[in-house]
Regions:
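Divalent metal-coordination and catalytic microenvironments
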Residues: 77, 105, 146, 196, ...
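Active-site-proximal loop/helix segments of hydrolase catalytic cores
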Residues: 374, 394-404, 434-441, 455-471, ...
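C-terminal regulatory/interaction regions
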Residues: 219, 277, 281-368, 378, ...
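Membrane-interface helix/helix-cap signal primarily in integral membrane proteins
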Residues: 1-100, 403-404, 424-425, 431-440, ...
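Membrane-interface amphipathic/re-entrant loop segments adjacent to transmembrane helices
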Residues: 36-50, 57, 91, 95, ...
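Hydrophobic alpha-helical transmembrane segments in multi-pass membrane proteins
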Residues: 29, 84-253, 269, 315-366, ...
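Conserved beta-strand hairpin/beta-sheet module of binuclear metal-dependent hydrolase folds
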Residues: 268-271, 365-444, 449, 546-572
Length: 692
């Protein structure tokens, strides 16, 4: 099936559709199963590119003989072939401010050009011939590692420098940098909005413009120049990083001072090894183990600095205009620096601009409650943030895989019965939804710590993203229904709760989580004794019980003045009936149970709750056919405004206790008003909720 690439579904998530379009990809061809694809022919690409990529594969192979993850780190350092680096190692490099080490940048391109010039000079070639050899070497290398923004920028600047050498002209770096940007944008205008393009050119400008102004009186001199270069590049990218990620790494400066000298030695030695690997693979294989100690040291330094205090300094949300103001001052620094009396003023102005870039503009108006249903595919992840700033995460999402089963409309007949009977193996997906979706969304929404994490039940589509979340954020208390389950993700969650000394509470009816300013989340289900009674009635032992897992899902009622919301986990009809018997008060918002399964959201529940807004957390083209048409129809017949994460992306509801605003990441056209229902979607104004 040919379809549009997915766009970003969560707050702060990059738009994947635009990112692919910048690379020339406008559609995705999706096969329904692994057997639907068959390789009929190999090696039919354009001959020069095919030869270059074959050479790359040949020289990467010996590098991967090193133990994991060191071989892949070395391949990333030399050739940008960082696929397969464990996520925890990649995250350590990111938190230490060393992620640039794992990708090819101007350093590698410059070394290739310089090495080619040296070899051509040793062969006593003329200037024109030497320049041609070096330019060709840069072209081949850029093709080998891929034309990323940093590689393209470095290649164009290298060619301009070589042209100046051939013409016996002096190189002017501002002109070269500007020309590289113009050439790259002429080929791909949308690259202007790419963060990688912006970071690459900002870092290069910092190296060339700011570093000379920041040279410290250190000995030896190479250390002074290294410190200045590191500081200049980091200052230049700081506003961009603050605006895009809301955090910076204070460990980056010392980490780079220690790691970059080793990288400076590793890269040329590694290039010599790769050339040898292409010519004499057996000899190269004998020399590869000599690279293990320095690469081991680089990896462990990254891990050390990632754990060091200050490796992540959280910033309040930074507006892009604030980042632009910081750059306006930074761009003026080199010119103002030449007027010596203004040096102190320049320093203060620069610091003030950077500080302003990290200070948000205070929001006007009364405190608000946020309920954000994140887009995590076929799963649940809901953020509650009270008006006092306390944050609670309900579930963490997580994809699941069902053996070799096909998905969506192509699922074979009877598959769901086999899944229910556990005849089809159920495993966690290799996609870490916690690291890739939940954590970035929480960061963007300003979450710095989680006062509580609530796991409604231990199925993979609710627990799969929580290990990454618990490892990343400080957590005050963890609640779950206390029903054992063999899910590896759940086992890991319990291990992290113990390791990080998080308070553990078995959720039971009547427990309350206080969110500040009168807001709270109260546990309505399960009641005390329910789990034991269920086991006694079914004869189940104390171990895992699939029937009990959904039946004992934690149900929460959220309250803030007149705002109310009911979060129902994966409960089904029997539990809904029990809740109605216990007494349910009307709620403005209903998180539809079990992703819209036909076994939930009964007429009795809708009559008792009388919701005005319903949110279904569901994956696009999911295997189960969720939401079931009968559930959607019941909601429509009840006049409920229904949002779906597969269509709308994340759904964000904000309330000041008297009004509610509904917004979606994939904005619907215009403002959809639900007359008499007190909700306006996609609008900056809301209407009063009144009584439910």
């Amino acid at each position: 099936r040919l379809e549009l690439p997915p766009d970003g579904g969560n707050p702060g998530e990059p738009n994947r559709r635009l990112a692919l379009r910048r690379r020339g990809v406008v559609a995705v061809l999706r096969a329904s199963g692994g057997t639907a694809l068959r390789i009929v022919r190999r090696g039919e690409g354009r001959a020069p590119v095919r030869w270059i990529l074959a050479w790359r594969d040949r020289i990467v192979r010996p590098l991967l003989a090193l133990p994991e993850p060191y071989g892949r780190v070395l391949a990333g350092l030399l050739l940008g072939a960082s696929v397969g680096i464990p996520p925890e190692v990649e995250e350590a490099f990111q938190r230490a401010g060393l992620l640039h080490v794992l990708v090819v940048s101007g350093t590698q391109v410059g070394l290739v050009g310089a090495a080619a010039l040296a070899v051509a000079g040793a062969m006593r070639l003329g200037v024109t011939a030497r320049v041609a050899v070096a330019a060709l070497a840069v072209l081949v290398f850029a093709t080998m590692v891929g034309w990323s923004a940093s590689v393209g920028r470095a290649a164009v600047m290298a060619w301009l420098a070589l042209a100046a050498l051939a013409l016996r002209r002096q190189t002017d770096w501002p002109s070269a940098l500007a020309a590289a940007a113009l050439i790259w944008l002429a080929a791909s205008p949308q690259a202007l909005f790419s963060l990688s393009f912006q970071l690459s050119f900002a870092a290069t400008w910092g190296l060339l413009a700011l570093a000379p102004l920041l040279t410290l009186p250190l000995r030896p001199r190479w250390l002074a120049h290294l410190a200045a270069a590191t500081l200049g590049a980091q200052v230049a990218v700081l506003p961009l990083l603050a605006a895009a990620f809301q955090w910076v790494s204070l460990a980056a400066f010392p980490a780079n001072l220690l790691v970059l000298p080793m990288v400076t030695v590793l890269v040329p030695a590694g290039f010599a090894l790769t050339v040898l690997a292409g010519l004499l693979p057996p000899l190269a294989a004998l020399l590869v183990p000599a690279f293990l100690p320095p690469v081991w040291l680089v990896v462990h330094l990254a891990r050390f600095f990632a754990r060091a205090p200050g490796s992540e300094v959280w910033l309040p949300p930074v507006a892009w205009w604030q980042a632009a103001l910081a750059y306006a001052v930074l761009l003026a620094v080199p010119a103002l620096h030449r007027a010596r009396p203004l040096r102190p003023i320049v320093a203060v102005a620069g610091a003030a601009a950077l500080l302003l870039g990290a200070v948000p503009v205070p929001a006007a108006g009364p405190p608000t409650m946020l309920l954000a249903v994140l887009d995590v595919g076929q799963g649940d992840a809901i953020l509650l943030r009270g008006p006092g700033g306390r944050s609670v995460l309900v579930d963490g999402g997580g994809e699941v895989e069902y053996g070799d089963a096909q998905r969506g409309a192509d699922a074979p007949p009877g598959l769901m019965d086999r899944v229910a009977a556990n005849a089809v193996p159920v495993t966690a997906s290799r996609f870490d939804v916690g690291r890739r979706r939940v954590i970035p969304a929480l960061r963007h929404l300003g979450v710095r710590r989680l006062d509580a994490v609530v796991l409604t039940h231990a199925h993979e589509d609710h627990v799969g993203g929580l290990p990454a979340v618990l490892a990343h954020f400080p957590v005050g208390v963890f609640l779950d229904p206390g029903v054992p389950h063999p899910s590896p993700s759940y086992v890991r969650v319990l291990d992290l709760v113990r390791e990080r000394r998080v308070a553990y509470v078995t959720a039971r009816r009547g427990h309350r989580l206080l969110l500040g300013e009168g807001a709270e989340a109260e546990v309505l289900w399960p009641p005390a004794g329910f789990v034991e009674q269920h086991r006694s009635a079914t004869g189940a032992g104390p171990g895992a019980d699939e029937d009990l897992t959904n039946a004992a899902s934690v149900v929460l009622q959220v309250r803030f003045a007149a705002f109310t919301a009911l979060l129902t986990g994966d409960i089904e009809a029997e539990t809904e009936e029990a809740l109605v018997r216990l007494g349910l008060v009307p709620s403005l918002v209903l998180k539809v149970a079990h992703h819209g399964s036909r076994t939930s959201t009964t007429p009795g529940l809708l009559t008792a709750v009388r919701p005005r807004v319903a949110v279904i957390s569901v994956g696009a083209d999911n295997l189960f056919g969720h939401p079931h048409p009968s559930v959607v129809r019941r909601l429509e017949d009840a006049g409920v405004a229904t949002y779906r994460t597969d269509l709308d992306g994340a759904v964000l509801l904000r309330s000041d206790g008297a009004r509610v605003w509904v917004g979606t990441v994939r904005r619907r056209a215009g403002c959809v008003r639900y007359t008499g229902r007190g909700v306006c979607a996609g609008s900056s104004t809301g209407s009063r909720m009144g009584s439910p």
